[in-house]
Amino acid sequence: MMDMVGYGQNGYYVQGGVNEDGSSSPERIAAVDANVENLAKFREYANSKGVAAGLWTESNLVPDSDNQTYWHLLRDFRKEVSVGGATTLKTDVAWVGPGYSFQLNGVKTAYDIITTAEQFRPNIISLDGWAGSQRFNSVWSGDQTGGNWEYIRFHIPTYIGSSLSGNPNIGSDMDGIFGGKALIAARDYQWKSFTPQMLNMDGWGTYMKAPYTFGDPYTGINRMYMKIKSQLMPYIYTTAVSASNMDTGNDDTGLPIVRAMFLEYPEDAYAYSRTMQYQFCLEQYFSCTSL
C-alpha cells in the first residue's frame, strides 16, 4: 500500500534567501532540511502500519533560484530519498511547465536519484507523457468523475491506445477522483486488476476511495481481484520487461502489457474492431480479457 503525501511545514510564506550566484542561504536550506526530517518521521510511522510513503509534487526537485518562492514549497528530492525514505514520486499539473523537455528532465532526474544514488526500485507516475516518457515513468489518466459506466467505457480504449503509442505503463484512478458508486467501483477493481497500475485518489469524491469503503459484498469482490493481481505480479513484471524491448524468451519482445487484439491475432480481421477487448500479459497463460 502506498500513501502519497505533502510535508512542507517549515518556512510558511517566507521568501528570499537566494544568494547572488543563485544558491540558497543556510536559513533557506535549513527550512528544506526540517521538512525532510518531518517526512522521515511520517515515513517511519507509515511503515509501521504497513504503508510506504511517496511524494506528490508540483515543484522543482531541487531548491530553485527564485527569490519569490515560498520556502515551504522548496524541494530537495535527493534528501527526500536518502533521508526521507521516499521511493515514489507523482508529478502533477505544474509539471507541464515549459513543455516537453521539462517533464522528461524531471522524471529522468528522479529516476537517476532513486536508482543510482540510493539503488532503490523507482515508482514514478506523471500526468504528462511524450515519446521517451516510458523510459522513466508511468502515465496516469485521472481527475475524472466516477460512479458511472462511461468512466469504465472510455478508459479501456485509452489503455489500449496508450499501449499502442509506445507507453505501456498506464494507470488511472479507481472509480474516478470525484463522485463514486459501489457497483461501479467494484467493476473498476475487477477489470483494472488486469492492467499495469491501479491508483486510489482520495479526498475529492462523494465517498472515500478505497477497496473497503462500501463493505461486503463489494469489499470481498475487490479483495479477491486484488489477490489475483498480487498473484499475477511475476507475470506482469516479466511482461513489463518484454514491453521495454528486452527479450524474455516468450516471443513477445516489444509488445505492451495491455495488447490490442490485432497484435496477437494480426490475421484475424475481426480483431481490428475490438476496441473494448484486449490481451493481457502472456498468451500461453492468460485468455483474453473481454469487456
Per-segment meaning from a language model:
Residues 1-291:
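Catalytic-domain carbohydrate-binding cleft regions of carbohydrate-active enzymes
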